[in-house]
């Protein structure tokens, strides 16, 4: 072993040396790249450095050849000064094509050698001319502070960068697009290393933790990440004075060497075990904090014979061998046990080299540099080591054969990585012909779907251009509004009047920008009130919830005279106040800490005062009813207004149940068979509420009066449409229902208390009284969908307590009914509810927990234009997002970080993935309950894909079994359809979606055969395979087919037994 410091191997300018922060060696061992304080990336000839060590280096100006090898005799091959700050990290990609460099200018540059470009000497430099040309292929700018370290995946598929902004950013290794930012650390991130098995990567931070991230790739651009573990124990007392915390993963994948750890007061290198992620071994050999630890990329053997001997042991026997020797054990290791070597260095200016065959360091080089050693890089053959220092020096360490051991072949590395799913044998091979056929079907379907989406996009663009060019008239479908003449003390906002799913409107009409409220303080300063982003979005039916953040564009169908989308959700009967309708509940508990001991030892309740501003001013019950004073729930009700108006545009063709009720206009024309749209106005003018001045109720169609009625009481709520019925609500809670032509269909419905909500959709009429009772009727069938239900369970009245017995509950922010008769209510707590008739219970559709714990909360779903009328689940989640943002105020990001910190605590590993899967399962159940078939189909496909990615074969089997059904033994409880979707067709889509995940292919093939998805293709492929194979391969295929037949027979028998 010898150490060489060539005088020319440094970052210098005009006799001044600059600090050097990083070094890396190319995979072919021909180039060494360094980065320093001078802002330059320098590439050196590795051969020239080795020749300098031997003393026979000769200078040469011969340019680099085109084969990729540096010019013989050249020292500095290239100098690049593109960065605007000090270069803190340089790393070659494992395939040798790219060089990634990071700097304190917050930018990562990806370089590639250009053999066609003539190298030129840098202007103003006094050194030798470049012999190679490297150009910037990509500039990656996403960090907010200095970049400290970066690393490539073993297959160069992804690039991960870390920096002082506490961020971990993942980039594509092919397109260099940003894939994801992981905010798992709470302080500077100063080191990163990849698992050679290509399953994990680890990051080290000044928050005294090492985070282990698992990543799964379904394709080159489809990568999912989750936190596998958080290691804290070895770093609890680690100092924060180091420049870096560069860690390294062992070549066999068993261990991580983490720098800047402590064992009591002593600075050590912690060895972290894979799988358990604990640290029971510490390398003690430094007197000051360690900056960098680096495993040699090769595995060694103790003797030359052991290195040359071919390993014939089974993988199970290899697993039993231990790679790390206990410190207290004898330094005698069997020759068959492979050895790994690790180098470490830091602020004590000492280089220490260890191997797993000896409990003590193999080499300790004191005062190797004058200042801190910042980086270490091994050559790919494992026989040399490079070190950089803040004194400007770059050291080269050359080992002789046998000093560290004897290098074994790379097959040994790959064989040991196989147990973790790495190496050449990591790819799971298909087990049968059926799996190959399934993969072909999946690929063909993906290509077909891609072409179909492209055709739809091109077709939509063409149709839009044609419509504009021809000057076609676009007829909007206006949402229900309250006339400006109906002056009332109710303050309306854009958010409050937005329906649960946005109303269909003309997409060509630009949305007006929301005006921000500007106030001037006493000192003359202007203050602009923050505007909630979701309130500025256009309320166009068919757009996805504003809570989504994906950049994917969602096509919106234009509402022309030929096709007018119909809103399938009840429009609000009146403009809700800001924050929703207030509620008061009577609690059933008393707070224990509100009791104090009296003089006689008896506990008495503390009296509390209620501020006057807690009582809502804009909404109050219109009458005092005995039911209200004794009810457990009290809701605010709208005040009586002079004018109520409801406008809408419908067509007669949209009357599936009432088409026979034609409307005759004044000229005698019958319009029942017309398909043209008609404009309806439902108007109520309140009188004095007595017989002398009654209230006038009227409906007009295309400005022609349909009917007029008079009632001797105040009307404060209206609902209905021109297809099924009209409805009015009196101040005493009675409801009068009219047919589209004005006939009283029912006697007045008496609820016993004033109404707070009156909504309608299709044939359904929804009413909620001020005492919290919910009613739902099918007006056409003249039946109640279910008995009256109280809102008390969802207002959480049972867990509330107050001395006075009455306290403020959550506000009702939205209430409505779908076209299929499903009630949806959202509260100011962010939760959305529906009442299920079969379960006789309220069910929670959405809650703020999913927003903080699920990876799918902000995922945009392209459900297609045909589903614009039934995006109930996503619409409820939009309400949840709005309420969560409103309640968090400006602390949303802070609360998110707190949640992330919780997910990273010990015992909560993998929690985010579990919550994400649970969120998808909740979405599926909610979509099925709301009969939203388009959402149900999308969520099932998403769920199948996720559980297949996670390798949850039991859940994949459970999902497929439910869609397949009981087989021959017909089960009366099983239905072949769900929400109008054929379960077997859904199963085909699920099988094709999970078919590319080989961990789940065995399950997918069985169910694909059960529904006849693979029968014809399997016969064709099997016969062609038999004719082309040899006799031995034929016997093997016959055995595989026989086993497959037995599996299919067993599967069918199991189905018939059930």
Swiss-Prot record:
Q: Where are the WD repeats?
A: 15-54, 82-121, 142-181, 184-223, 239-282, 319-364, 368-409
One Pfam family per UniProt = Hira
Enumerate the subcellular locations listed in this protein's record, separating them with semicolons: Nucleus
- Give the CC-aspect GO terms: chromatin; HIR complex; nucleus
> Would I find Repeat among this entry's keywords?
yes
- In its keyword annotation, does this UniProt entry include Transcription? yes
Tell me which InterPro entries the record gives: CAF1B_HIR1_beta-prop (IPR055410), HIR1-like (IPR031120), HIRA-like_C (IPR011494), HIRA_B_motif (IPR019015), WD40/YVTN_repeat-like_dom_sf (IPR015943), WD40_repeat_dom_sf (IPR036322), WD40_rpt (IPR001680)
Question: Per its UniProt record, what PROSITE patterns does this chain match?
Answer: WD_REPEATS_1, WD_REPEATS_2, WD_REPEATS_REGION
List the biased-composition ranges (Polar residues): 661-678, 687-696
Question: What family is it from?
Answer: Belongs to the WD repeat HIR1 family.
- The protein's name in its UniProt record: Protein HIR1
């Amino acid at each position: 072993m010898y150490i060489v410091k060539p005088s020319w191997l440094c970052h210098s300018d005009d006799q001044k040396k600059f600090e050097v922060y990083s070094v890396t060696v190319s995979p072919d061992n021909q180039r060494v790249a360094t980065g320093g304080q001078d802002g330059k990336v320098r590439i050196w000839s590795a051969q020239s450095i080795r020749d300098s060590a031997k003393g026979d280096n000769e200078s040469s100006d011969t340019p680099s050849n085109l084969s990729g090898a540096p010019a013989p005799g050249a020292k500095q091959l290239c100098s690049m000064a593109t960065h605007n700050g000090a270069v803190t990290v340089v790393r070659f990609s494992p395939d040798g094509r790219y060089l990634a460099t990071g700097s304190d200018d917050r930018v990562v540059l990806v370089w590639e050698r250009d053999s066609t470009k003539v190298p030129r000497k840098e202007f103003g430099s006094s050194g030798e001319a470049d012999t190679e040309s490297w150009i910037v292929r990509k500039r990656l700018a996403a960090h907010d502070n200095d970049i400290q370290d970066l690393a490539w995946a073993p297959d160069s598929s992804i690039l991960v960068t870390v920096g002082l902004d506490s961020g971990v950013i993942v980039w594509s290794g092919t397109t260099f697009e940003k894939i994801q930012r992981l905010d798992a650390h709470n302080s500077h991130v100063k080191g990163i290393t990849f698992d050679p098995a290509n399953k994990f990567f680890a990051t080290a931070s000044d928050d005294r933790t090492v985070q282990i991230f698992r990543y799964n790739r379904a394709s080159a651009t489809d990568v999912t990440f989750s936190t596998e573990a958080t290691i804290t124990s070895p770093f609890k007392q680690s100092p924060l004075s180091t420049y870096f915390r560069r860690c390294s993963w062992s070549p066999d994948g068993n261990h991580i060497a983490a720098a800047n750890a402590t064992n009591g007061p002593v600075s050590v290198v912690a060895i972290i075990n894979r799988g358990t992620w604990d640290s029971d071994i510490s390398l003690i050999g430094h007197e000051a904090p360690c900056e960098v630890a680096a495993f040699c990329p090769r595995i060694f053997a103790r003797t030359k014979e052991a290195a040359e001997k071919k390993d014939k042991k089974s993988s199970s026997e290899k697993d039993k061998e231990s790679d790390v020797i206990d410190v207290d054990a004898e330094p005698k290791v069997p020759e068959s046990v492979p050895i790994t070597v690790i180098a470490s260095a830091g602020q004590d200016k000492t280089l220490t080299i260890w191997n797993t065959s000896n409990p003590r360091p193999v080499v300790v080089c004191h005062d190797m540099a004058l200042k801190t050693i910042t980086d270490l890089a091994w050559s790919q053959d494992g026989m040399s080591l490079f070190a950089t220092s803040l004194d400007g020096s770059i050291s080269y360490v050359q080992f002789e054969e046998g000093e560290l051991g004897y290098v074994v072949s790379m097959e040994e590395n790959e064989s040991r990585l196989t147990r973790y799913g790495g190496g050449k044998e990591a790819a799971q091979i298909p087990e049968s012909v059926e799996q190959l056929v399934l993969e072909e079907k999946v690929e063909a379907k993906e290509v077909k779907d891609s072409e179909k989406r492209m055709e739809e996009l091109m077709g939509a663009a063409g149709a839009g251009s044609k419509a504009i060019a021809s000057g076609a008239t676009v007829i909007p479908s206006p949402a229900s509004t309250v006339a400006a003449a109906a002056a009332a003390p109710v303050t309306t906002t854009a958010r409050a009047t937005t329906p649960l799913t946005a109303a269909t409107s003309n997409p060509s009409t630009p949305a007006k920008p929301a005006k921000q409220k500007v106030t001037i303080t006493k000192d003359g300063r202007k203050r602009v009130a923050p505007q909630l982003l979701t309130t500025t979005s256009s309320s166009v039916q068919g757009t996805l919830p504003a809570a989504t953040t994906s950049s994917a564009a969602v096509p919106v169908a234009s509402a022309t005279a030929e096709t007018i989308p119909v809103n399938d959700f009840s429009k609000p009967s009146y403009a809700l106040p800001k924050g929703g309708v207030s509620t008061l509940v009577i609690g059933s508990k008393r707070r224990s800490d509100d009791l104090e001991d009296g003089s006689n030892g008896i506990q008495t309740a503390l009296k509390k005062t209620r501020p006057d501003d807690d009582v809502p001013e804009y909404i109050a019950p219109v009458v005092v009813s005995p039911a209200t004073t004794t009810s457990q729930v009290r809701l605010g009700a709208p005040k009586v207004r002079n004018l109520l108006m409801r406008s809408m545009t419908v067509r007669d063709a949209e009357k599936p149940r009432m088409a026979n009720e034609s409307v005759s206009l004044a000229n005698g024309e019958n319009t029942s068979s017309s398909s043209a749209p008609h404009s309806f106005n439902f108007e109520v003018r309140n009188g004095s509420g007595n017989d002398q001045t009654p209230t006038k109720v009227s409906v007009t169609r295309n400005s022609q009066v349909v009917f007029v009625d008079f009632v001797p009481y105040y009307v404060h709520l209206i609902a209905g449409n021109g297809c099924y019925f009209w409805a009015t609500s009196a101040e005493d809670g009675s409801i009068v229902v009219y047919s589209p032509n004005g006939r009283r269909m029912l006697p007045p419905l008496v609820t016993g208390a004033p109404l707070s909500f009156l909504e309608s959709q299709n044939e359904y009429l929804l009413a909620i009284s001020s005492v919290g009772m919910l009613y739902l009727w099918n007006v056409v069938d003249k039946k109640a969908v279910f008995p009256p239900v109280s809102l008390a369970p969802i207002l959480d009245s049972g867990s509330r307590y107050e001395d006075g017995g009455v306290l403020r509950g959550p506000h009702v922010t939205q209430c409505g009914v779908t076209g299929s008769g499903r009630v949806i209510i959202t509260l100011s707590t962010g939760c959305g509810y529906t009442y299920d008739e079969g379960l006789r219970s309220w069910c929670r559709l959405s809650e703020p927990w999913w927003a903080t714990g699920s990876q799918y909360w902000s995922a945009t779903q392209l459900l297609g234009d045909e589903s614009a009328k039934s995006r109930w689940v996503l619409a409820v989640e939009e309400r949840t997002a709005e309420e969560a943002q409103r309640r968090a105020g400006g602390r949303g990001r802070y609360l998110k970080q707190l949640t992330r910190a919780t997910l990273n605590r010990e015992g909560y590993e993998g929690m985010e993935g579990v919550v994400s899967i649970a969120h998808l399962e909740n979405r599926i159940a909610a979509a099925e309950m709301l009969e939203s078939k388009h959402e149900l189909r999308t969520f099932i496909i998403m769920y199948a894909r996720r559980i297949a990615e996670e390798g949850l074969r039991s859940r994949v089997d459970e999902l497929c079994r439910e869609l397949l059904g009981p087989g021959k033994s017909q089960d009366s409880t099983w239905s072949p359809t769900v929400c109008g979707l054929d379960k077997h067709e859904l199963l085909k889509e699920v099988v094709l979606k999970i078919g590319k995940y080989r961990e789940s292919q065995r399950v997918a093939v069985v169910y694909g055969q059960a529904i006849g998805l693979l029968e014809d293709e399997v016969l064709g492929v099997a016969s062609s395979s038999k004719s082309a194979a040899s006799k031995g391969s034929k016997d093997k295929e016959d055995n595989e087919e026989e086993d497959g037949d037995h599996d299919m027979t067993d599967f069918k028998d199991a189905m018939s037994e059930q």
